[in-house]
Amino acid sequence: MKIIADTNTFLAVALYEPEREKIIRLTLGHDLVAPDILPFEIGNALSAMLKRKRIQPEELLPVWDVTQQIPVDLRSVNIREALKTASKFNIYAYDAYFIECAISLYCPLITLDQRMIEVARSMGVKIMEVI
């Protein structure tokens, strides 16, 4: 089965967050898919964590490297449709890209973002429950 994986799940695994083991259990043996903006979003999140001192400079590249070792199929998304979703539900376009990916591929979504879960569910997307 293909599973659309949100950026925060990659970071939770790489940073050994409490949700790490459950994410791995839920996705083991399945194919992860994400919008092709995933590497950029991971890079942005890591630089924000560095800026907020959540990670140290010497951790930045090793954490990046771990996220890049997780196999994922990067897909383009219909940005126009994603923007409609972002506008309708007042969410960031980046979040809407993951929802649009799940809708267009008829795949479940795994995320730690509660608002994204609410919006995706309201649009008929199946959620892989982590929390």
Please give the residue ranges for each predicted region.
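Structured helix-beta-strand junction loops
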Residues: G29-H30, V66-I70, L105, M123
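Active-site neighborhoods of divalent-metal-dependent phosphate/nucleic-acid chemistry enzymes
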Residues: Q69-R115
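Active-site-proximal, substrate-binding regions of enzyme catalytic domains
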Residues: G43-I79
